[in-house]
Amino acid sequence: YKGMYRDLTNHTVELRVWTGAEWQWMHCRLYGKEFPEDGQLMSPSVVYEHPYTMLQVPVKEVVQDASGIKERIAAKRNVCGVQFGTKDVFAVASVLTADGKETAVRYFKGGKRYSDQCQRVVDHIDKSHASHGENGKGPVNQRYWMQIKHLNSHYAHQISREIVEYCKAHEVGIIAFPKYAESYEKHVKKASGNYSALHLSTRIREYLTYKAWQSGILVIDINAKGLHENCAVCGANIVSVDKKTQECTCEAGHTTNRYLNTARNTAKRCLAQFQKKQKASETAG
């Protein structure tokens, strides 16, 4: 409530706390998402979530475009299919018009740089463990783990921002992601390693969702079943996948990046799914 906090910024806040004898102002440092520049900050609340004390701040924002999916499909807005990748590629995006024509493709890279930076920090942690034994697991390495945390946050914000800006530049109204089974996602992430490009996919998606919402772009999930099995160019079955080059080839001989193929199919399925619903609604009406 007003009077119980003051000087709230992205990184600090002062809270009025009861010590048991008197009220005092306590200076606190904050870690987490940046507050939106155009947002109106509401009264924060302190919530304890073991082992952290969290400051939750409601934000009131004006959304540029509050229309729903049906309205955007009816208005023939562009759709962007996004598939997360591995190695150097964080994500691949394919932009389609309402009639299914591809107008733009982009690979969002930087995964190798992210992995290398994380690995250098992990090497420091391992050396500290070897030098300090049990003590190396405590405060000695706290600053290194904070570096890992900051790297995760930095790259997740950077890639999510790049995707949203790319979609804005291509007048995208809907961003579609393939939705996989939770067990499958865990298996793939475990196989890719702790500090791979795919390791950040969940956080990138989280940051991207609210950034897109602020820009008037909807983010939705599309059932991923079978998206990787067919060629996005001709619809033929995929018959081979080269995991070294990440290329896939269909029965008709079309060869393309397998993540791009899935991104294209995701955008296509999104269009087909909601255009079908639109036609059914018009027929019923």
Regions inferred by a protein language model and the residue ranges of each:
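Positively charged, helix-rich recognition surfaces that bind polyanionic ligands
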Residues: 53-285
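Acidic carboxylate diad motif detector
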Residues: 1-52
